[in-house]
């Protein structure tokens, strides 16, 4: 892959074309895909992220009968990325999940089981199961926008016997 060192940058048109062909050949060796993972720490906030870049020349591996964003693709638990964080304005827990392949027509559901596990389902497939600290938590909102699920989970109210 090209480096950011100015002395390594091609200067002429032929050098630039040569470097481009080399880069495309490297991508071709990797089936046109690059994957990575990284973490950013900002004070008390930690962000883990994954990325995948795919470059091709128009030849799609999908068959013509399988449209992009098929709900079957969304059930792959390996591609679902989940992040949890405390809400800034309440005691709620916010769960954000990247669900590739989910469309507006795809059934997405979440439930808190009696065991305290939060399950996220796409269609009939459970794509993620998270253990919650409080088994009495309640899901107060569920939205899916652009293949991103956002859940707000509220802790159970303390009963009169807990005080």
Curated annotation (Swiss-Prot):
Location relative to the cell: Gas vesicle; Cytoplasm
Biased composition (Basic and acidic residues): 78-88
Keyword check for Cytoplasm: yes
Protein keywords: Cytoplasm, Gas vesicle, Plasmid
Disordered, as annotated region: 57-92
Keyword Cytoplasm: yes
Any one annotated GO CC term: gas vesicle
Recorded superkingdom: Archaea
Main location: other
Induction of expression: In PHH4 (a deletion of the p-vac locus) transcribed in all growth phases, maximal expression in mid-stationary phase. An unstable 6kb transcript able to cover gvpD-gvpE-gvpF-gvpG-gvpH-gvpI-gvpJ-gvpK-gvpL-gvpM is detected, as well as smaller transcripts. Gas vesicles appear earlier when grown in static culture, possibly due to O(2)-limitation.
Family the entry assigns: Belongs to the gas vesicle GvpH family.
Role: A minor component of the gas vesicle, also found in soluble extracts. Proteins GvpF to GvpM might be involved in nucleating gas vesicle formation. Gas vesicles are hollow, gas filled proteinaceous nanostructures found in several microbial planktonic microorganisms. They allow positioning of halobacteria at the optimal depth for growth in the poorly aerated, shallow brine pools of their habitat. Expression of 2 c-vac DNA fragments containing 2 divergently transcribed regions (gvpE-gvpF-gvpG-gvpH-gvpI-gvpJ-gvpK-gvpL-gvpM and gvpA-gvpC-gvpN-gvpO) allows H.volcanii to produce gas vesicles.
Subunit structure: GvpF to GvpM interact with each other in vitro, and may form multi-subunit complex(es). Interacts with GvpC. Might interact with GvpA.
Additional facts recorded: Encoded in a 14-gene locus called c-vac which produces cylindrical gas vesicles only in the stationary growth phase.
Identification of the protein by name: Gas vesicle protein H2
